[in-house]
Every structure is written in structure tokens, then in C-alpha cells.
Amino acid sequence: MHAHWRSDSQRAMRLRALCRKKLGVLACAGYAVAMTDAPASAVPMQYPPASPRIALVFGGSGQIGEPLLHGLLAAGWQVHAYSRTIQPARPGLHWHLGELGTLSMPPLPVDVVFSCGPLDAFADWYQRLPVHAPRVVAFGSTSLEVKRDSLDATERDVARRLREAEATLFALAAARGAAATVLRPTLVYGAGRDRTLSAIAALARRSGWFVLSRSACGLRQPVHVQDLAEAALAVLASATTHGQSYALGGGETLRYRDMVHRVLAVLQPPARLLLLPHAVFALLLALAHACGRLRGMNRAALQRMREDLVFDLAPARRDFGYAPRAFAPDAAMLGVTSGAAVRQ
């Protein structure tokens, strides 16, 4: 009986040694194994955290780029951004001096390239250099459609360059195995640096009133810069957006003159809106041009005030959950202080 016991014991010892040997292989494969008389249990080993994703941003100091940088840093990205002027350093944000026309390859491999500046300049840079980032997100403009048939030749050229830049970007990205998305904002506001609503607020604040044509009843969809920055981040998680362009308007559609009225209402004190017959307004505009003023308000812009510039946001809502805010500006969004307007 003792011989049988010793034989069984020896067999058990050999079996346990064999188990230890084989389980050691499992441990080397990435599992820590507890060797006790109780059943062995495999516990995943602790690996170092994954390296942070790296983004390259052009136009990072602009009105859309700034909130985009905040969003990237908050999400744990390492960001490399270019600017033509020296910018203050921040944790996780690396600034580089330079302009697109003279830049060479990115300083290191990146996961995504964002362009928040002129699309044609970015497309030229992307074409000039063999950049191999798996993801590209660039801002264009709905001017591609709005100014296609403009009365002004310069505006038609803007639309042409936007159209060609989009085509170049999509073609190059596809050839390089990258996924590109183009976002086309409508009328941008929110940082006090736009050339339309903030300019209206500044002019009205100086005079205490603003003159507009009664015919300025075309519909608009003003969009906040924060909503645009969030859209740029949201498309990264949606493969449906690859190779697509999206119009990005605001969450409210309103008449041009109602939009202007809301802008004037945030001033302290509120500025008055003076509505004139179209012919009278056009004459005053011509006189202003003769005096070298209001050059940005040309005949084509006056015509567009009467047109509905409304875009379908359904594709953006469907593909990446785009949900822009309604138009509710305040003084800070328009770049004006809360002090009293200067009456002239």
C-alpha cells in the first residue's frame, strides 16, 4: 500500500512540475499565473499606457483653431501647431514658427492633420510634401457654392479656388491611403474676429446706429466657432465622414436683418437699426465707396442680403452628431466691451 502511495505521489509531483513548466510559457505570453494548490487563475499583466495621439494643427491661433486646440488638449492629445507669430507655450502644446508656403515636412509622424486656415494654401502644402498622416480634417467654406455665380469676379475666383482645393485634397488623401474630411462653415461668429457680425457690432458701437436695406430679408445660419471646433473633433470617430464634405451652419435660421438686430441688441446701450429703401441704401453705399469706405460691402454682397443662404445640416447631424446652438450672441462673442457706445 505504501508503494502504491509513493507511486501516486511521484506521479502527482511529476504532473505538477509539468504544469509549472507549461504555465510558465503562458506567463511569458503576457499572463501572471498563481501557482498554489488551488486552481490556477490567469490575471492580465499591467502594460504601460498607450502613447498619446499626436495632432498637427494649422491656423491654431485663429478663431476656429483656438477652441480646437482647447478640445484636443482636454482630450489628452499632444498638439503641434504652426503660427506666423510667437505664441505662449502650454503643457501638451508645441508651437512652431512658420508659414504654409515655406514649411517643410511635419517635425514628427502625426495621427491627424487639422487645417483651420485658407483651404487653398493648405491643399498646396499637402500637394507639395509627401505627408502620410492617416487622417486629415480641413475647413473650407460654403462660399464654394454661395459665390460660384457672384456678380464680382474676385468672389467667383474665391469659389473656384475652394472647389479646386477640395478636389486636390481628396485626390491626394485617397492616393496616400489617408481619410480626408472637409467642413464648410456658413457665417462664423463667436470669437469677435469675424469680418461680418463683429464688424457690424464695432461700427454700430462707434455711432450708436446701423443702416441697412429693407430688402435684407435673406435667410442666414450663423454658426459659433465652438460648434465648429467640436465638429472637427467629432468627425474623427466617424468612418462615414471619410472622403466627404459637410456644410456646417448654426442651429437657427433667421432673416438677415433680424440677425443684425440681435447683434445691435447686445451693445450697451443697444444701437438703433435704421432700415432704408433698397435704392436709397445702394446710393449711400456707392457714396461710401467713393470716399474709400465700406469696401467689403460690394454690389455682390448687397445682392446676397436678399438671398436665402441656407444649407442642409442633416448629413452632419446623421454622420457625426452635429448639434449647433441657436443664435444668441453676447458682447464678448462679437469682440466688443460692455462700455457705452460713442454717439457721433
Q: Where in this protein do the model-derived segments appear?
A:
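N-terminal Rossmann NAD(P)H-binding glycine-rich loop of SDR-like oxidoreductase domains
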Residues: L56-L73
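N-terminal Rossmann-fold cofactor-binding loop
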Residues: Y82-I86
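NAD(P)H-binding glycine-rich loop region in Rossmannoid oxidoreductase-like domains
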Residues: L93-P134, A138, T142-A153
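Active-site Tyr-X1-5-Lys
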Residues: D157-T181
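Conserved SDR Rossmann-fold cofactor-binding beta-strand/turn motif
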Residues: R184-P185, Y189
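Substrate-positioning beta->alpha
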Residues: D194-A199, R214-L236, G243-A247
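Alpha-helical membrane-targeting segments
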Residues: A199-V225, P270-L309
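Mid/C-terminal beta-alpha module of Rossmann-like enzyme folds, strongest
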Residues: V235-M297, L313, R318-Q344
